[in-house]
């Protein structure tokens, strides 16, 4: 049984609802009619139940409040549209967790993690390091756009995750209460955005125009990598989700991940991430391996034209205000 105390946490707020046309007709219906003869009488519920691009036309923009781990699940869909509130926005020492965890045996471990952050702060450790003690059950928020089809894919994923951990029943219920997705979901295929990385895939290399980098990195870095949607990613996130200590894993805990993309895209990412002051330290291990397969020179640095586009970000990290 789901704990009675603090049953609900995931919060969905619709910012912009783009499911209806200006004359009040569902956009899936509009798109469907444009592709069919005028005498087509397919019911709207039937159209909304079809697992096809027609249901990628209507969409909603939402603010989502959830755990860090849930944010990473959302971002694992390679077609995600997201602008996240990173854990840097709020003081790491003041992180909060859902009531679901406050009244559980994990709370003692969560308190210890908060104490470690405070101890590091007193010792003068920089924020880049002490924030890694934040647990992945900590609250965060982000803004996202999801199509009708995307909503159902997320809903079906939550149904699967709820079989592993009852906490996900909260998110599944919130999604269903907001959009009544259960009425349409059965006809949609289940898409696993976090397929398990296999042992024979734990290698780096180059095949034609594709470069693959295998790394054991922090969950915090994974959170940055996964935002680059042109990357094909496989990792052991599902293994972490299934672990008994899942919710007290931290941003600093390791995750095994394989990252693949075309050479030109790798160069685009390096161009953004190779600034030694702003982000190079965080991305260094990935960049070093990628450089074994990609020719990267001074022209690929973000400041190659004599102007640093990340001046303010670099200053904030240097002063520990970011």
Residue spans of the language-model regions?
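Family-specific signature for flavin-dependent thymidylate synthase
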Residues: 1-322
